[in-house]
Amino acid sequence: IISSKSAAAKRAGVQLRAVVTTSLTEFPPEDIVVIIGNALDNAIRAAQESNGKTADLHIQPQGAYSSILVANDVLKPVLTENPELNTTKKARMRHGFGIQNMRKAVERNQGMMRFYESNNRFVCDILLLN
């Protein structure tokens, strides 16, 4: 999934930097694909519209959890204007399910997910219980 999203980022003119220091093999592969795939799709799309055009993925152990952190540059604050993170795509009936699906996958794996912004970056911070 990371290779595929890295290629997509490159096509979009976005630099995707990935640091992976732990495997996620104890989790259902379909949940990992939903979580990482949607998080990176969103990050790449937002970074493409930003000045910095970078997105980062960090997967690492954090105590009893596995941490998945995806961050991207943003042009303007996201959460102030769109706190529910509703889709901004024109075809709203076909879009807007990514974050919902991510939440369900995180919950199935006894995890937690939060979104925040810092230094002109949007961050999706996920912890999954090992």
Where are these regions (language model features)?
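Short beta-to-alpha transition helix within the HATPase_c
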Residues: 1-12, 66
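Conserved short strand/loop->alpha-helix "switch" segment adjacent to the catalytic nucleotide/phosphoryl-transfer site
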Residues: 16-36
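Heptad-repeat coiled-coil segments of the DHp/HisKA dimerization-phosphoacceptor module
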Residues: 16-22, 61-63, 74, 117
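Conserved ATP-binding N-box helix of the HATPase_c
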Residues: 29-52, 105
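Short beta-strand/loop element within the Bergerat-fold HATPase_c
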Residues: 50, 54-64
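Glycine-rich/acidic phosphate-handling loop/turn and adjacent ATP-lid/helix
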Residues: 66-97
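Glycine-rich nucleotide-binding loop
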Residues: 76, 118-125
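Conserved glycine-/histidine-rich ATP-lid loop and adjacent helix of the Bergerat-fold HATPase_c
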Residues: 101-111
